Amino acid sequence: MNPYQNKNEYETLNASQKKLNISNNYTRYPIENSPKQLLQSTNYKDWLNMCQQNQQYGGDFETFIDSGELSAYTIVVGTVLTGFGFTTPLGLALIGFGTLIPVLFPAQDQSNTWSDFITQTKNIIKKEIASTYISNANKILNRSFNVISTYHNHLKTWENNPNPQNTQDVRTQIQLVHYHFQNVIPELVNSCPPNPSDCDYYNILVLSSYAQAANLHLTVLNQAVKFEAYLKNNRQFDYLEPLPTAIDYYPVLTKAIEDYTNYCVTTYKKGLNLIKTTPDSNLDGNINWNTYNTYRTKMTTAVLDLVALFPNYDVGKYPIGVQSELTREIYQVLNFEESPYKYYDFQYQEDSLTRRPHLFTWLDSLNFYEKAQTTPNNFFTSHYNMFHYTLDNISQKSSVFGNHNVTDKLKSLGLATNIYIFLLNVISLDNKYLNDYNNISKMDFFITNGTRLLEKELTAGSGQITYDVNKNIFGLPILKRRENQGNPTLFPTYDNYSHILSFIKSLSIPATYKTQVYTFAWTHSSVDPKNTIYTHLTTQIPAVKANSLGTASKVVQGPGHTGGDLIDFKDHFKITCQHSNFQQSYFIRIRYASNGSANTRAVINLSIPGVAELGMALNPTFSGTDYTNLKYKDFQYLEFSNEVKFAPNQNISLVFNRSDVYTNTTVLIDKIEFLPITRSIREDREKQKLETVQQIINTFYANPIKNTLQSELTDYDIDQAANLVECISEELYPKEKMLLLDEVKNAKQLSQSRNVLQNGDFESATLGWTTSDNITIQEDDPIFKGHYLHMSGARDIDGTIFPTYIFQKIDESKLKPYTRYLVRGFVGSSKDVELVVSRYGEEIDAIMNVPADLNYLYPSTFDCEGSNRCETSAVPANIGNTSDMLYSCQYDTGKKHVVCQDSHQFSFTIDTGALDTNENIGVWVMFKISSPDGYASLDNLEVIEEGPIDGEALSRVKHMEKKWNDQMEAKRSETQQAYDVAKQAIDALFTNVQDEALQFDTTLAQIQYAEYLVQSIPYVYNDWLSDVPGMNYDIYVELDARVAQARYLYDTRNIIKNGDFTQGVMGWHVTGNADVQQIDGVSVLVLSNWSAGVSQNVHLQHNHGYVLRVIAKKEGPGNGYVTLMDCEENQEKLTFTSCEEGYITKTVDVFPDTDRVRIEIGETEGSFYIESIELICMNE
């Protein structure tokens, strides 16, 4: 009876602790032979013997599991991964050295391992080099044994008895080991042949040894920092002798991490390039892809996997244990003997036999098609993979690889959740008997769930084979060395394996004896299928473990030191995690690289169910657009400031979105990290916060007595520093917080006193400023501290645009001669806001368009206590370092106008010449919006003294000053001329200088002409704002008032109502085709037909004489007339003909016999134009 037909047994396998299950979606027994019994031994010696003595096929299996050096690599990486999971200060060193010493320095032959490291690389590349160099390299490396062993023994002694002497011994040994590697590693690199190409090859050969030595050095430096910090916190060790402390070791550690990382990756890539550029003589001068892949696979396990863990040694970034994962894939190859290079170029082989960068996948099933035949020697023709993304329940199907025919039969091996293949045997027909592409006949799969072993198989046809076969074992060595095993097998076991099968690809070779080349892709067993967020460790989750990716985002190849690929983040991606402790709080941060500038910083948001949305702007980390060779320093960490406590849900979705508009800004996401917040971490963060604020405020001052601020320090910087002070814990640091608050208040007062601009922070509303109506002072935006200026768009009234503006003139008395002043401020957001700063004529004219990309940093609403900035993601914007972001919007003296995009902070300069308090030129600062859809929020506006000018700047300002004086002289002359003419015309209107009465013969035309002359006076209004007074505004107002007086007197003495037709035909009786038209700015009554008539009845004083005065013109044939008639039918008539050119004035004296008269206007033919009609009493 087959043991797996028992339902309860199958369910027992399903209830896995870590890994193994068979999916119900597939045939449980897709093969003819029953599966073998479960093998529960951890020693595979018996299993190997069974394979090698297989009676059906005969012969031995060729193993792809290297002994010696490859197992050493996987064990070292496994040991380091395990060591980082320990949170005790000495965990990594004690566990690490206890495992690494017997691996790197085996007791039976201490020189073997280092020699094997070098030999295995030499066997891949196969280039000659003098053996003396290799021998010397081994000697250099083996000198490390005694140093490391002595240090390890002292550590164990101290652990058992941490007395002062043992403590001092450990400190001494740390220093000795550090000095040793400081000398040995450079010596290893520098002991190369003198020829540059031979030197490069030598360094490629010793690279794996270099990486192992670097790892030992970093382990010691990491331990040094932790050990010294431990001693500092235990004051009974205060009397120890002076030696380097954690403060001394930490910068050495971080520099070593960077240097070792960059060197390893650079040298590794040199090896790849050497293979790609070195033709293989055995392949007719072509490039050998198999050699390339073998080098890549072995150097990944030997070097890159280890290098990817180097950042974890940084105690500052990882103060507690860390859970890391390696998501890269490596490949083992079957059937490469029938040379593919004859048919395909190198790149085609690479694309066909490896997977392109992709989200991390988990194998769901392997599905092979067997040839439709009943005879012996059957084989698989083609196959496809089913897989899923991490914590995604949707299974994806790969392409079908091979030569599939519709008659082929499908056989599948299904894998349920948490079941993995860690080893497989492959039996394939010998190539010379093949008549079709595929040649695998049988595969045995060794499967684990972490607690038990299951073997399954896929067999083509009946399994009967009469031909010769090839037998191969695929897999990778164990992950951990167990000290109680003595000399354990290197073959993986169900509970000690370093890799699992993730994918199978193949490439058909159209050779005489047709062959299918297979690659088996393996991923590291450190990858967690559940994305578990740990409560006691810093959890690293690679970004490629996302299960959803936006259409614009993609996965790109990693630089070699990240342990896997990266997400090129353009729109969004989602990661699903699991978490069980709902009381634990976390900080979340990302490790990333970005080429954004200070003005085009990418902005990301993080959405988590049950958690307020998080957001932050990413600082640029590298320049340029090439991200294929990024160095260690090109990746940085950035943390969301909010603490996060996950909702009670086992699966948690984290959705990352980009909310900026800078699509050309590259953002590469490496990892998402979760830092559990403990009391010690919180206290450490508060201490760091305090020290950071203290350092920031200490940079404010230009002298020790702190009475002068640094010129580059902005008022906005001080406000933000005040916010940081407010966020310091009063519980932990009440005294320090109060002292810092006094410091920042002092800085604010100094900032205000040096600002020659009044009320630049708008704390006194608009005091000192002149504004339009649609200006408001608000305090509801946490981007600013306190009040800020809000400008709405220009008003559009019936097609007329009325700009929004605010300006201030700095009086001459506040300025110094021949001095440069900084004009700067902060823009929360704006569109089409124009900044004009002028003394001698628009020295600064800038349009500022700044996106509202800071809102993600702050909550959108205030509570009764205001905005809680301490729970936001706000990061101080380079306080004290303004060379980058703060002054990126600057004026170019070579341009008259500047358009500033994106920069929130602006800074310009303006220079003064000689001062003249009588002229009071001053400095004008103005903000203006001329478009209805414009807007702006501004604050922290400053004009401060930078210093005296000299040299070219002094010459330039003197030139500008002279030019301005010349222009002003010309303007004054022009003004005086216009003023004199206008004044003379106005004086002629009146009978006396008091303007009490008009001259009797003053006409409307004369008044209108005088008004025209007044309107012609130049420079009445500001050059930039049409309703703001200019240099001639006062004289204009004076003359305009006299014209208004004349007009008033004119209207008062005219007995006829609306005699100038400015109110249309109001007061007149109209018949026929007559109306009032605007002609050359004057209201004119127009009669266009003989049938039209206009009349008005007027009441007069009896027995008074009157003058009837008409200004009119006639066009065309006929006459135009104005008739005055009294009730006694006495009349006077003024007649106009077209013979009289233009408008003429005609008068007639009338002496009505009655107190009522009628004024009638008409014409006989053509058109008649009347500009004004007056009836004036002769007594006026």
Swiss-Prot record:
Kindly name one Pfam family recorded for this protein: Cry1Ac_dom-VII
Q: Which InterPro entries match?
A: Cry1Ac-like_dom-VII (IPR048645), Cry_V (IPR041587), Galactose-bd-like_sf (IPR008979), Pest_crys (IPR038979), Pest_crys_dom-III (IPR005638), Pest_crys_dom_I (IPR005639), Pest_crys_N_sf (IPR036716), Pest_cryst_cen_dom_sf (IPR036399)
* SUPFAM superfamilies found in the cross-reference section: delta-Endotoxin (insectocide), middle domain, delta-Endotoxin (insectocide), N-terminal domain, Galactose-binding domain-like
GO function terms (MF aspect) = signaling receptor binding; toxin activity
Q: Which domain of life is it from?
A: Bacteria
* Swiss-Prot/TrEMBL keywords: Plasmid, Sporulation, Toxin, Virulence
What GO terms in the biological process aspect are recorded for it?
sporulation resulting in formation of a cellular spore; symbiont-mediated killing of host cell
Belongs to which family? Belongs to the delta endotoxin family.
Describe the function of this protein: Promotes colloidosmotic lysis by binding to the midgut epithelial cells of insects.
- Beyond the main fields, what else does the record say? Toxic segment of the protein is located in the N-terminus. Diverse amino acid mutations in sequence block 667-676 have no direct effect on the insecticidal activity but alter the structural stability of the toxin protein molecule.
Recorded protein name is Pesticidal crystal protein Cry4Aa
Species for this entry: Bacillus thuringiensis subsp. israelensis
